Amino acid sequence: MPNNTLKQGSKIENVSPSKGHVPSFWKQFINNPKSMSSENITVPRSPTSLSRNAQPTTLKRPPLSSRPYSYNTPTKDRKSFSKSAKQNNNNNNANSGTSPHAEFKNYRDMFLSNRNGFTGRVFGVTLAESLSVASAEVIVQSELVSFGRIPIVVAKCGAYLKANGLETSGIFRIAGNGKRVKALQYIFSSPPDYGTKFNDWETYTVHDVASLLRRYLNNLAEPLIPLSLYEQFRNPLRSRPRILRHMLTHEVSHPNANKTNNVTVKSSRQNYNDDGANDGDIEKEDAKDDEEKRRRKIRHKRRLTRDIRAAIKEYEELFVTLSNDTKQLTIYLLDLLSLFARQSQFNLMSGRNLAAIFQPSILSHPQHDMDPKEYELSRLVVEFLIEYSYKLLPHLLKLAKREQQERLSTENKKNNGDKQKTDPIEIPKITSSDSPPIVSSNKNPPAIDNNNKLDHTTLSPISTSIPENSSDLQTSKMLKPPKQRRPHSKSFGSTPVPPDVIASNKRRTSLFPWLHKPGILSDTGDNGDLTATEAEGDDYEEENVDPYGQSPSSVHSGSLPKQHYLPIPRMNRSLSGNSTNSSFNTRPISMILTSGNDNSADQLELLSNTHSNNERSNALPLTEDDGDERNSRSRKRESWFQRLTSRSGSANRA
C-alpha cells in the first residue's frame, strides 16, 4: 500500500498545467521576485560533488525574454521586466568594458557574415579582388567606347533586370527565394568561368536576381564611396539646405519620366462675386498677392537651380577622385537605378525608395548606422545622385573617353619607340614612272608565308611625284609595320586618279571556266607562279569588263578575235579592273618589283615601252631554265589558239 501511494503522489506531481492555466502561471511566475533575481546558481564542478571537499562553481541566471510565448502578459509587468533586463545588461557591459552599441554591431556583423555562407573570392571580399577573379567590360552604346570593367555578377544581373524587370512591381524591395538566391550565388562563385557562360535564367525570378545583386553590393568589404571620402560626398548637399528642403517636400524625378500614375493637385481659388462696394479693391489686392507669390516662386526656382548646378559641379569633381574600379561600378549602378526610377509609375520604386535600399552599399559609415539624422542625409545624397545621374554621366563618360585615348596614345608611342630601336625597316629604291598606280583591294588578302624561300619584295604604293634622289627616302624616318592589315591599300600619289578596286576575288571567265586563277585572286590565297595561259586568260577577261559594273561581260558568239598577248615573267603583281576616270583606253600595266635582279628599274622601263607601242616582245630573262620552259609553253599555246581560230573561222564561212 505505501508503494501505491507513492506512485500516485508522483503521478500527481508530474501533471503539467492545462492550456487555460498557462496565462495565470506566467503571471505568478513573473510576479514572483525570485524569478527576477540575479542571484547565482550553484552547480557542482564534478559528479563527485556529494563529497565534502567539492567546491561548487557559480553560473549567472540567464535573462528571460521580454515577450514570452504567451501574448497575455500585462504591460506593467513587461515594463518592469524590461527595466530589470536593462540593468542586467548595463552591469554585464560595465564588467566587460564594452558599450552595448559596439557589442550589437559586432553581433550583427558576425551574423551577416555567417548567415550567407560566403565562399570563394567573389562575394564578401573587396571590389579589387572580385574584379581580379571575374570581370566584364562595359561599352557605351552611343560612342562604342570601352568605359571600364565591372564584376561579372553585376553585369549579368544588370542585363537581366534591364530586359525583364523594369516594370516589375516592388523590384529590389521584395526579397527572392533564399534557396534560389544561394544557388545563383554558388554559380557566380564557382571557378573556372564564375558564371560568365551562365544563361539559364528560366528557373529564377526577377526578385531572385535583384536579391543576388543586393547581396553582392551589401557584402563588399567597403561601400562604393570609400570611408575616406564619406564626408566630402555629403558636403555638397549639407552646405545647401535649400536642396534638402526641396527634396523632402517635393518628389524629385527625371524630366523624361512618365507620370501617368502621379496625382497632381492644383490649388484652385474660389472667387465669390458679392455685390459690394469694395469688390474692386479686393481684386486688386488679390492680384498683387498673386504677383508677389509668382515672383517669389520664380526667385526660389532660380536659386534652387543655381544650387543644384553647383552641387552637380562638385560631384563631377569628386567622382574624378575615386579609383577607376569604384568609379566605373558606381556609375553603372547609378545608370541602372535611374532606369528603374523612370519607370516608377509601373514598378512603384521611385528614386527615394531606391535610395533607401541601396544607400548602405553606396554611401554609409559604421558610426552613423544608428543615427537617423545622418542616415537621412546619406539617403538624400544617394537619391540626388540617382535622380540627377543624367547630368553627371555624360561628363564622366567624356572624362573616361579622354583618359582612354590618352592611355592608348601613350601605349602606342611606347610600342613604336621599342620597334624603332629593335626592328628598323629598309625602304627599297623606287624610281618615278608615268603610269598611274595599280592598287589591289581584295576583301580577303592572301596570308603572307614567312617560310617561303622564293624571293619576293613588298609592293608599296608609288606616287608620280617622287624625288630624284632616292637617298632622301632612305634617310627619312623608318616605316613602322601596321598592327592590323588593312583590307586594301590607298594611293598616295599626287595625281587625282582613284585606285581601281576588284569587286570580288571569285570571278570566273565564261570562256575558260576550267582555267586556274592566279594566286592573288584564288580563294585559297596561294601565291603560286603565274603561267602564260593564266595570264592571257586574265587579260582577256579584264578587257571585257564592264566599266560601270566591274563584272566580266558575257560572250555570245563562238568566234574568238585575234589578240596580241604579252608574255609575263614569273612575278607577283596586283590586278585591277578598268577605271572610269582614267585617261587610258587600255588596261595599265602593273608595276612589278623583283628582288632577284638589280636592274628592276630597267625592267619596268622596258615593260612600259612595250605596252605603249603595242608590240609583242620577249619575256625578261630570269634564268635559263625558266626561259626555256616558258618558250615551250608559249609555242604550245600559240598552236592551240591557231587551231581554235581556224575552226571558228571555217564555221563562220560555212
Swiss-Prot record:
Any matching Pfam family: RhoGAP
One annotated GO biological process: negative regulation of Rho protein signal transduction
One of the record's GO molecular function terms: GTPase activator activity
UniProt keyword terms in alphabetical order: Cytoplasm, Cytoskeleton, GTPase activation, Phosphoprotein
Span of domain Rho-GAP: 134-393
Span list, region Disordered: 1-101, 249-298, 407-504, 516-597, 609-654
Amino acid composition bias (Basic residues), ranges on this chain: 480-489
Source organism superkingdom: Eukaryota
In-chain residues carrying the UniProt-annotated modification Phosphoserine: 37, 46, 435, 491, 632
Bias (Polar residues) ranges: 1-17, 29-58, 255-273, 430-444, 457-477, 573-597, 642-654
GO cellular component terms, semicolon-separated: cell cortex; cytoskeleton
Comp. bias regions, Acidic residues: 535-545
Comp. bias (Basic and acidic residues): 407-426, 629-640
Annotated site, Arginine finger, chain positions: 173
Localization per Swiss-Prot or TrEMBL: Cytoplasm, Cytoskeleton
Other facts: Present with 1420 molecules/cell in log phase SD medium.
Function: GTPase-activating protein for RHO1. Must be involved in the normal assembly or function or both of actin. Plays an essential role only at low temperatures.
Descriptive protein name: GTPase-activating protein SAC7
Species: Saccharomyces cerevisiae (strain ATCC 204508 / S288c)
Lineage: Eukaryota, Fungi, Dikarya, Ascomycota, Saccharomycotina
Originating gene: SAC7
